Structure formats: structure tokens, C-alpha cells
Regions:
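Short, extreme N-terminal segment that most often corresponds to the first beta-strand
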Residues: 1-30
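Charged interaction segments
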Residues: 31-33, 37-167
Length: 167
């Protein structure tokens, strides 16, 4: 069974109204965090729809489908209720691509609007987000992220929406 997700991880409190406005769902995963599935198509579409052009600071060697659109930071701020405040809540972006135990993962963590340069994997990103691993488990397994194996089907429509905009 594969594991292929792209997601935003944000802390609580979580703004459910903002989640509806952004067409996302925040799944509680424990330790005060929410997992928000999205996709590269989702971020490209939202970036275009909002007229944004800025990019996130993402390592150049990350795959092309790793979200680089700065709209991700806006989404994280909205979900955290930080849109009108000067505080910028930490957030992480994670991507997995595994099948049969073979594959890879990528992650970035952002604190105060800046990427934590040392973070390149999910466990490191989760540590930045404050996750304390349970005895005998890593951070990923502590939160049960293996249960979230693929991007939900409702996000597939963003591929067509991007095509419709010529993106």
C-alpha cells in the first residue's frame, strides 16, 4: 500500500470558517496540530486566483510538485487566525511518495515567516512544530500520519481548474 500525500501542518486554534473559505479540512492529529491536505494544483490555482506571484523559500532540489507558492503562507495564517496580526504562526509543508516501503519524503518548516533551513524531512518539521515523540516511536508515527495515505479525491478538481486557467 502506498503513501502519497501533500499537506500543510498547522497548530491550533484552528479557524474552521477560514478552512471553509479556502476549501480545506483540518484533521486533528494530536499534540495541538491539524493536518490539511492540499496539492500542487490546489496551491497553483489559489495563487493565481488571489493574484499572488511570490514563492516560498523551498530547497531547489525538492521535486516540482512540492508547493512553492507563497499562498501557502497565507493559507496557514488564515487557518491559524493570524491574518490581521503581526504574529506569524509556525507551519510545515510535507510531501510523501512511497509504495511498498520504497520512496521518499520532503518537508519544510516555517517559523516567524522564515524557513528553518535544517529541516528537510517530516520528523524534523514535526519537531519544529513541537511534536514530542512517544516512547519507541518517531514523530510521524506518534501523530499517526501513516493513516493518512493519500490526498482526498475532492482535491482532484483543482487539476481541471488549473487547466481551465491555462496554468
Amino acid at each position: 500500500m502506498g503513501h502519497s500525500i501533500c499537506a500543510l501542518i498547522v497548530g491550533e486554534p484552528f479557524d474552521e470558517r477560514a478552512a471553509r473559505e479556502w476549501d480545506v479540512v483540518g484533521l486533528p492529529v494530536g499534540q495541538g496540530l491539524r493536518l490539511v491536505h492540499f496539492s500542487h494544483y490546489y496551491t497553483v490555482y489559489m495563487q493565481a486566483r488571489r493574484g499572488e506571484t511570490a514563492t516560498l523559500d523551498v530547497p531547489a532540489d525538492f521535486p516540482g510538485i512540492f508547493p512553492r507558492e507563497a499562498v501557502v503562507a497565507g493559507l496557514a495564517a488564515a487557518l491559524s487566525g493570524d491574518v490581521l496580526s503581526e504574529a506569524v504562526a509556525p507551519f510545515a509543508v510535507v510531501l510523501t511518495d512511497y509504495f511498498g516501503g520504497v520512496g521518499d519524503q520532503w518537508a519544510c518548516a516555517f517559523v516567524a515567516g522564515r524557513r528553518v533551513k535544517a529541516v528537510r524531512d517530516i520528523n524534523a518539521a514535526l519537531r519544529v512544530m513541537g511534536v514530542q515523540a512517544a516512547a519507541g516511536l518517531d514523530e510521524f508515527d506518534t501523530l499517526g500520519l501513516a493513516r493518512h495515505r493519500r490526498t482526498p479525491d475532492h482535491l482532484a478538481r483543482y487539476e481541471d481548474l488549473c487547466d481551465g486557467l491555462g496554468l
